[in-house]
């Protein structure tokens, strides 16, 4: 996988089409999880569960930001054994799986949850492992404009989308301030240009979902 390209290409989708992901792609995802997906703490037991749209009613009562759940044709649950580093390990693994889905031209959206037991009960899961991460995935709604990132270059070129069903990424100029909020004076001079390590560090931060 070309991680740099996938990190730049990925986007967090807020509206999915009803089209289901082909079984072949789902099989590739499972194989990747079993054989390739890196673990920060290999000794932590994990399990990957792929759900279809039929799971949405159960998830609506147990997951989502302030009980608002993103509807999708599929949901990915990463289960984990209890461990002091379970959250970090699961986050690392799921983000890698998100990049794999991006490589397969499949869109994703992380979902918020606070109660693993509530989700397990809603889905009738009997595994002793805990819900550690949830991602909705499928094919995002098509928009009139394909431009995705609102990343402003050092030469002030701004790329924007007029209509979108995804969360746009922030430009370096939107993220970075000089000594006080909203002060951009001297920002370009401080970071020099694209090969400047400071600019590259801020650009990397701007690629987060």
Listing of model-derived features with the role each one plays in the protein:
Residues 1-209:
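Acidic, surface-exposed loops and disordered segments
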């Amino acid at each position: 996988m070309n991680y740099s390209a996938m990190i730049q290409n990925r986007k967090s989708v807020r509206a999915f089409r009803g089209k289901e992901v082909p079984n072949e792609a789902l099989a590739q995802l499972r194989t990747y999880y079993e054989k390739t997906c890196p673990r920060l703490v290999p000794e932590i037991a994990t399990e990957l569960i792929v759900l279809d749209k039929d799971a949405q009613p159960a998830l609506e009562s147990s997951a989502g930001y302030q009980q608002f759940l993103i509807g999708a044709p599929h949901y990915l649950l990463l289960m984990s054994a209890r461990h002091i580093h379970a959250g970090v390990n699961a986050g690392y693994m799921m983000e890698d799986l998100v990049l794999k889905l991006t490589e397969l031209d499949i869109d994703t959206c992380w979902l918020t949850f606070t109660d693993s037991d509530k989700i397990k009960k809603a889905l009738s899961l009997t595994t002793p492992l805990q819900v550690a991460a949830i991602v909705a995935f499928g094919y995002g709604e098509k928009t009139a404009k394909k431009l995705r990132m609102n990343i402003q270059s050092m030469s002030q070129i701004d790329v924007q989308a007029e209509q979108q069903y995804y969360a746009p990424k922030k430009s370096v100029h939107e993220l970075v301030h000089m000594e006080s909020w909203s002060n951009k004076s001297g920002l370009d001079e401080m970071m020099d240009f694209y090969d400047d390590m400071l600019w590259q560090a801020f650009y990397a931060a701007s690629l987060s979902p």
